[in-house]
Amino acid sequence: MNFVLALTINTLLALLLMILTFWLPQLNPYMEKSDPYECGFDPAYPARIPFSMKFFLVAITFLLFDLEIALLLPLPWALQTTNLPLMTTSSLMLIIILALGLTYEWSQKGLDWTE
């Protein structure tokens, strides 16, 4: 009962805060609020400089492959299971999917830095 009560209160509080943020927007934004803080000085250069889209795509690709590799980390413990053929097959399928994804990225020139 206490868990249900705590869950209900937390859910209602979260919903209340979300509703308040939509109902009470910032009514008078001005330029000084949107500028980055520079210790009281005017910024020396623009704070919102664009970065390369190629870098963004390579970074996202790295994160996806890194996450998929992290799925293989518990493999030594999983090999101690009684259903070893299923575990080996699923691990090999994951490695094959990773290899196919890397091959696709490489063939589509997603890993090249040349513009």
Swiss-Prot record:
Q: What is its EC number?
A: 7.1.1.2
Q: Does the keyword Translocase apply?
A: yes
Q: What is its main location?
A: mitochondrion
Q: Which reactions does this protein catalyse?
A: a ubiquinone + NADH + 5 H(+)(in) = a ubiquinol + NAD(+) + 4 H(+)(out)
GO biological process terms, alphabetically, are:
mitochondrial electron transport, NADH to ubiquinone
Q: Which UniProt keywords apply?
A: Electron transport, Membrane, Mitochondrion, Mitochondrion inner membrane, NAD, Respiratory chain, Translocase, Transmembrane, Transmembrane helix, Transport, Ubiquinone
**One Pfam family per UniProt:** Oxidored_q4
Record membrane topology: Multi-pass membrane protein
Q: GO cellular-component terms in the record?
A: mitochondrial inner membrane; NADH dehydrogenase complex
Q: Where are the transmembrane segments?
A: 3-23, 55-75, 84-104
Subcellular location per UniProt equals: Mitochondrion inner membrane
Q: Does the keyword Disulfide bond apply?
A: no
One GO molecular-function entry: NADH dehydrogenase (ubiquinone) activity
Family according to the record? Belongs to the complex I subunit 3 family.
Spell out the subunit comment: Core subunit of respiratory chain NADH dehydrogenase (Complex I) which is composed of 45 different subunits. Interacts with TMEM186. Interacts with TMEM242.
Its biological function?
A: Core subunit of the mitochondrial membrane respiratory chain NADH dehydrogenase (Complex I) which catalyzes electron transfer from NADH through the respiratory chain, using ubiquinone as an electron acceptor. Essential for the catalytic activity of complex I.
- What's the protein here called? NADH-ubiquinone oxidoreductase chain 3
